[in-house]
Regions:
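Nucleotidyltransferase catalytic core that binds NTPs
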Residues: 1-152
Length: 152
């Protein structure tokens, strides 16, 4: 799960690899009140649906509340999270322990691919709003929406 504001090719890579490991992947699009988003929840869900449409065994759902509650409702056996280079590991490990303690659900951490390890949605937002070309980091639909949102 994530806020996917916007979804990046790094996210798509993690979903693709996760789908190779398990029978079914549910991508949870979550609200994150701590982040200032640029796209609405409906837009984000649409972008994620479009980006993962060709990956077998993947569905997209809205997460409203705790991730572990969502996982329990969906009958999930595990949470799969991507790790970028740098500081993600410590945070994700803490969350994995908390989620396990609250629900018994395990977390699988997948390292980002080399080409995606430094990409984050916040970096994409920052670059796009300042006129940067982010086309090699986001799905085509997202790139078009960013150009519409931040015309330069």
């Amino acid at each position: 799960s994530g806020s996917f504001d916007p979804i990046t090719l790094g996210h798509v890579d993690i979903v693709t690899r996760a789908a190779e490991l398990v029978d079914e992947v549910v991508v949870g699009v979550a609200m994150n009140s701590a982040k200032n988003g640029i796209f609405s929840m409906d837009e984000r869900v649409a972008f994620v649906n479009d980006a993962v449409a060709d990956i077998p065994g993947v569905e997209v759902a809205l997460v409203d509340g705790l991730l572990v509650d969502f996982c329990t409702e969906m009958g999930a056996d595990a949470i799969i999270r991507g790790l970028r280079f740098g500081g993600d590991f410590d945070y994700e490990l803490q969350m994995a322990h908390l989620n396990k303690a609250m629900s018994g659900i395990e977390t699988i951490l997948l390292p980002a691919g080399r080409e995606f390890g430094t990409i984050s949605s916040s970096m994409i937002r920052s670059a796009a709003c300042n006129g940067g070309n982010v086309s090699e980091f986001v799905p085509e639909m997202v790139n078009a929406a960013l150009h519409e949102r931040f015309p330069h």
